[in-house]
UniProtKB/Swiss-Prot annotation:
Description of post-translational modifications: The Fe-S cluster can be nitrosylated by nitric oxide (NO).
Subcellular location per the Swiss-Prot or TrEMBL entry: Cytoplasm
Binding site for [4Fe-4S] cluster: C12, C53, C56, C62
Cross-referenced Pfam families: Whib (PF02467)
Name of the gene encoding the protein in the UniProt record: whiB6
Swiss-Prot/TrEMBL keywords: 4Fe-4S, Cytoplasm, Disulfide bond, DNA-binding, Iron, Iron-sulfur, Metal-binding, Transcription, Transcription regulation
Induction: Weakly expressed in exponential phase, more induced upon entry into stationary phase. 3-fold induced by streptomycin and pH 4.5, 4-fold by ethanol. Slightly induced during entry into hypoxia, by cAMP, in macrophage infection and 5-fold induced by NO. Repressed by WhiB4.
Name of the protein in question: Probable transcriptional regulator WhiB6
InterPro entries tied to this protein: 4FE4S_WBL (IPR034768), Whib (IPR003482)
């Protein structure tokens, strides 16, 4: 299935017009370009990867997945998630906000008796 976007002003949108994406059965949302080259998003992400990520039609769902996935790190929905520290908490807060403001509510993680 091929998706075309009207905005032609940016290189990013020009890229997406030519990307052949498969629709997932679960969400009926196209897979992002990150599925074709995952190492580019998990190592040190470059500016082009961030730009592609921020224009992805799956961005809001990706933001929710990042917040709900334990141990998520790297580039998710255009936001870099560090391994640990305050920067990680800040990035996850940004992703939660992106997801929820765009119609993808984030499930709160339950605290187990062992981790409490």
């Amino acid at each position: 299935m091929r998706y075309a976007f009207a905005a032609e002003a940016t290189t990013c949108n020009a890229f997406w017009r030519n990307v052949d994406m498969t629709v997932t059965a679960l969400y009926e949302v196209p897979l992002g370009v990150c599925t074709q080259d995952p190492d580019r998003w998990t190592t040190t992400p470059d500016d082009e990867a961030k730009t592609l990520c921020r224009a992805c039609p799956r961005r809001w769902l990706c933001a929710r997945d990042a917040v709900e996935s334990a141990g998520a790190e790297g580039l998710w929905a255009g936001v870099v998630i560090p391994e640990s520290g305050r920067a990680r908490a800040f990035a996850l807060g940004q992703l939660r906000s992106l997801a929820e403001r765009n119609g993808y509510p984030v499930r709160d993680h339950r605290v187990s008796a062992q981790s409490a």
